[in-house]
Amino acid sequence: MYYQKDESETSNIIKSPIFRDKETFLYKNRYAVFIFSSIAALGLFAYSTNYLNETPTMNSELYESYLKIPMKYGELDEYSTIDLFKQYKTNFSRSYETDDEESLRYTNFKNFLTIIDKRNEDEFIYGSGKSLHGITKFADLTEDEFKKGFLGYRPTYDTNAIVKEVDTELVNRTVVNWANIYTTAVKDQGYCGSCWAFSATEQIESDSIRMGLLTVDDALSPEQIVQCDNIDYGCEGGNTDTAFEYVMNAGGIERDSDYPYTSYYDVTGECTSDTTKYMVTVNEYYSLKDEDDMIAYTLSTGPLSVCVAASTWSSYVSGIITSCDTDVDHCVQAVGVNTDEGYWIVRNSWGTDWGLEGYIWLETGVDMCMISYDPKYTITTLV
């Protein structure tokens, strides 16, 4: 059904804290680059002004160019890097049991700083330089630890999804953000490769809210899918198609409050679902053929479950990603799109202490991070 524009709803959309305009983003990047600091909620923390004294003074001719490139962590000496690591541990409540582990995590941290520099360079070389990478809560992990614990997409070669086309000519808006309108709050999968279950659960939530079956306070249970979907692999990964199939075959899904998430630390327990507590079920699920149809659907109707290439997101801080990998390894939810400024609004499941309060922006029109690889939505009914 085509969505008719409602002025009061549009007002709520524009007021959403994650719907920031281009000028705000550029100002925050300018702040981050020039004084080497940013906001803790966006993944960076304030640096001691002593670090600025160790960098060359910028003259007026170089001022504009410095505003366009992030400061390089590789330029810090060892003393400053150690001090930075101490600050990281404080801000992200990190403590280590042994000196050996502390040494290992410090080595990982230094490697992460190198990765940040490389990704910021790639944004300028291969992209449009519209995003900023920096220190996040993942900074003391190895790349393998990050991929194992926070990604988790596994491909499926057999799907019952029905391909739908969208009439793009019916769309009469260019900007929409369904966050907090057709979505529940941002969730945190913890150190468990359960992104696929979160993406599927969030899509079932959104479609049910859109159809008037649930409210934004009715969070459903990703843990039920993690524990009870025998086709997928719990914290070792899975697929949204088979997650939707599980809910269809099981006959429904419970509320998160009835079947809470317990797999934060890579432990998948036994299935304990209770059919008497099922809220909604999936009748059918659909896929879209390309990014144009995705944009039209999102603008006119609602969010989409998507699976993407997210290995470089570990260091994302703010802005529009314009350079990305192409290996699909993570499932999330596209909750809005701004075709005027050219970006998707994507809800992740890594908590609100990552990215833009749990969200990330991806460039539109170029299949950034393979966003059009596996878009899905569902038709749900009450149990």
Predicted regions and their residues:
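Short, low-complexity, Lys/Arg-enriched N-terminal segments of secretory-pathway carbohydrate enzymes
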Residues: M1-Y27
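Catalytic-core signature of thiol
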Residues: N29-F34, F45-V383
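Sec-dependent, cleavable N-terminal signal peptides
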Residues: I39-L44
